[in-house]
Amino acid sequence: NKNIDLFSLDVDGIDYWILKELPKNFSKIAIIEFNSTFGSEKEITVPYKENFDRSKYHYSNLCYGASLKAINNIMKKKGFIFIGTNLHRVNAFFVSKKYINKIGLRIPKNKDLKKYVDSNIRESRSKNNLLSYLSGKKKIQIIKDCEIIDLSKKTPKRLKIKDIF
């Protein structure tokens, strides 16, 4: 739709799969949630499930959505340029290539996304559904047996987190 100025996607789960179905240049500006726990180097997402619920997928609430690299790469294919994230580093901002010259922003290098994934949000849960405030590698360790889709190959591959981290 050529009339959409701002599009925001934050469904705590299958954001990547929704983006995949959208047409190119679907808005001028897009804000897309990503999972900072997945880091900056892996191009991964959770598998598609129609009624995805992050707390049911894993009790910790840490295995959901897609990595920033996965979101960035699909947005490039849709005609967008990554311009940064919010302060909590969980929402990525993109501008359509058609409008990027109308704003005076420094465009980040896509090869170095590391500084955009160090989230200061600590929302992990214990098996008793209590906040556990995990950070760093402890977050990956607790979700190591969760299935994800590795999008870095020509044919996406279903793996467990422990297979790629």
Across the structure, where does each feature detected by a protein language model lie?
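Active-site segment flanking the S-adenosylmethionine/decSAM binding pocket
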Residues: 1-53
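Rossmann-like AdoMet/SAM-dependent catalytic core
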Residues: 41-165
